Amino acid sequence: MMLEASLRVIASRGHEVTLLDAAKLHVVQNLSCYAGGGRNCASPDAGPYRCWAHKNSVDDPAKYGGEDEMPVIYDGIADADVVLWATSVRWMSHSSLLQRLIERMNTLENRASVYGEANPLAGKLAGVIVAGQHYEGQKVAICLQETFIRLGFTVPLDAQMVWQRTLDLNLEQGDGSNRPHVGLHLVSPAGRGQITRFVEALGL
């Protein structure tokens, strides 16, 4: 809901938006490509996307549960000026799905750090959206911002939007003392203000 609300505001300001749902894609697990001196990841021999996980799944889809669809994400990033990453909080961390995407972006960062080429992520802005019942969503957002900076994105300090329903780390179920549902928050003055600050931090 937070991502969709942000995209609506961005679109209303005249920007083209595209929503990619990685949960609907078959993204193969990252491989250990750092053998052989650490130059296997992003090798030009690893196909057009320079990713062995993708190339191997194309060569032998049965072994990998089907052909890898990470190129949908790669191409989406390549076409974008700004990328928003959204995740739930899982045990004080981001989701395993987002972690898989982060690991699969090694091939982009390694083109610069290993092969001395231009980083395809350089100059692209990124923002982070984090939602959870509790478990310190703010810390998850900050960690993700640092991760995307290391990958090569430009991440403004205020380009994060966090929803954490309760500050009580021991509260597993909702009760009347919790904050309102996120949907109610997003249409409130406070929620609209939060979206505006997030979007404007990205220059949108």
Kindly label every feature range from the protein language model:
Residues 18-49, 54-58, 168-176:
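N-terminal beta-loop-helix "entrance" segment that forms/cooperates
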Residues 18-20, 84, 127-130, 159-162:
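Hydrophobic/aromatic beta-strand patches that form the interior of the parallel beta-sheet core
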Residues 1-13:
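N-terminal beta1-alpha1 ligand-phosphate binding loop
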Residues 47-50, 55-151:
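Helix-loop-strand module that forms the ligand-binding subsite of alpha/beta enzymes
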Residues 1-2, 101, 140, 191-194, ...:
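Hydrophobic alpha-helical membrane-association signature
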Residues 23, 90, 161:
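Residue-level "edge-of-site" marker
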Residues 149-204:
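Glycine-rich phosphate/pyrophosphate-binding loop and the adjoining helix
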Residues 12-18, 153-154:
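A generic structural motif
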